[in-house]
Amino acid sequence: MDISKDLICIGFEGTAEKTGVGIINSKGEVLFNKTIIYTPPVQGIHPREAADHHAETFVKLLKEALAVVPLEKIDLVSFSLGPGLGPSLRVTATTARALSLSINKPIIGVNHCISHVEIGKLKTDAVDPLTLYVSGGNTQVLAYTGKKYRVIGETLDIAIGNCLDQFARHCNMPHPGGVYVEKYAKNGNKFIKLPYTVKGMDISLSGLLTAAMKKYDSKERIEDVCHSLQETSFSMLTEITERALAHTNKAEVMLVGGVAANNRLKEMLNVMCAEQNVDFYVPEREFCGDNGAMIAWLGILQYLNGKRMDLNDTKPISNYRSDMVEVNWIPEENNENIKSRIIPEHLIGKGAEADISKGRYLEFESITKERVKKGYRILELDELIRMRRTVKEARFLTAIKELGIYAPSIFDIDKERKKITMSYIHGKIAKEKIEEGNLDFCEDLGKIIGKMHVGGIVHNDLTTSNFIVSDNTFVIDFGLGKYSDLVEDKAIDLIVLKKSIMSIHYDKFDLVWNKIVEGYKTYEMSESVLECMKEVEKRARYL
């Protein structure tokens, strides 16, 4: 094929209950794009029924598409290789293979999640965004670093779309339930406290779902439960996006996926981005949910940059993670022009939770950490979170010293302003030391974490930004900390750290992580925690 000419690609999307066919050219012009959603006769989607729907609907959509763009003009066939439901993926792959063979044109299987990101970039002005991808089967925070889209944060159990749909089914709402939850939520006027679970840049939604169902069963107004479910879950999503933003220092945030159609979620992210002084993008609704055009576009990007497949390579991958894909279509020279998040001059740091300023307390150098109000959260929830975390942080900074772990000294706590003044530590954060190639302290990190875990303390936000290395290594930022003797809580603590290292220090990951594990192994309980860690990583479903 002559790749110097304008290529036309047809894309087949069928990872769950939506069947999509799209045609796009290499200029990024969408020539055809239509999606049909399978609506089950009873609540819940059966994978086999969804696959049967694809088999019938692809034929119909293909006829419509080829009435717009004749078959002889198609140069390339692309399809969603995964992740998704096995039966749906197999029907989609079979359809794409059949067309590819019949017209003797090349075929490319692409990652469904990354397709969302790339069509979003095409349809907005985003260049290098931190992407929140939210749908029925996926909840991820993605960032491009080191020739891969890295999963910076994600759900530890169910996806946000699934959470909303399951709640809607429980309340006898039609499918897809998220639309009806949003509709009811607009008329809610009472906030009901529900579980709010953030662990580093990950979230857990299963406890929230169960609690919301119980509130509905206890005869709370459905409008109030929907309002509270949305406010809680979307605040969690916005918070982990903000945490990832602080960790990666990206200057753009983009929202994609089916749940991106929710106006309240868009509003919350827009407010957060304004507070962080970064740009916010969301593609038009047609390109938020699953569609064939996004599959076709990623197929073109990969093909034009050397990706080739034969039929043996087209077996679907139901657990096809975004970070399994080697990105060959983003030029390295782009990195030189990428913008970074700008920290206000009067601050020495601006995290997801707090503004950090330097000063003096009596004769001592100090820093002040103020948990500022978050405009994206409703007042009741925001006050609760900021107060709880301020008190927690002060408590745990004192508690870890009793375990022989170094931490800043607290000078003053202002509960009204959610502000802590503490000693200034001369040193560098671990993130900077690793970037410089200094890894001598990494084993000490493992020992410190082991000492915390033996003492029954789980940090819940372990990143390389939360250790300060000087003559000794200090641990900071305990706002998410808790007491726990559960092996799984300690395993998740390590997983949070592992993912943060992989996302930023990918080129040094093995060296850094192995040193941390060696240090952690000096404690007796380490073996059971490390084994549990493997089990937790295996059972992650939403990819």
Swiss-Prot record:
Primary residence: cytoplasm
Region called Kae1, residue ranges: 1-329
Entry's EC annotation: 2.3.1.234, 2.7.11.1
A family per Pfam: TsaD
Annotated InterPro entries: ATPase_NBD, Bud32, Gcp-like_dom, KAE1/TsaD, Kae1_archaea_euk, Kinase-like_dom_sf, RIO_dom, tRNA_threonyl_synthase/kinase
UniProt catalytic activity: L-seryl-[protein] + ATP = O-phospho-L-seryl-[protein] + ADP + H(+); L-threonyl-[protein] + ATP = O-phospho-L-threonyl-[protein] + ADP + H(+); L-threonylcarbamoyladenylate + adenosine(37) in tRNA = N(6)-L-threonylcarbamoyladenosine(37) in tRNA + AMP + H(+)
Subcellular localization(s) per the UniProt record: Cytoplasm
Binding positions for Fe cation per the UniProt entry: H112, H116, Y133, D290
GO molecular function: ATP binding; iron ion binding; metalloendopeptidase activity; N(6)-L-threonylcarbamoyladenine synthase activity; protein serine kinase activity; protein serine/threonine kinase activity; protein serine/threonine/tyrosine kinase activity; zinc ion binding
Keyword Acyltransferase on entry: yes
The protein's required cofactors: Fe(2+)
UniProtKB keywords: Acyltransferase, ATP-binding, Cytoplasm, Iron, Kinase, Metal-binding, Multifunctional enzyme, Nucleotide-binding, Serine/threonine-protein kinase, Transferase, tRNA processing
Binding positions (ATP): I348, G349, K350, G351, A352, E353, A354, D355, I356, K369
Positions of the catalytic residues: D461
Taxonomic superkingdom: Archaea
UniProt-listed PANTHER family: TRNA N6-ADENOSINE THREONYLCARBAMOYLTRANSFERASE
Family as reported in the entry's similarity comment: In the N-terminal section; belongs to the KAE1 / TsaD family.
Protein name, entry field: Probable bifunctional tRNA threonylcarbamoyladenosine biosynthesis protein
Organism of derivation: Methanococcus maripaludis (strain C6 / ATCC BAA-1332)
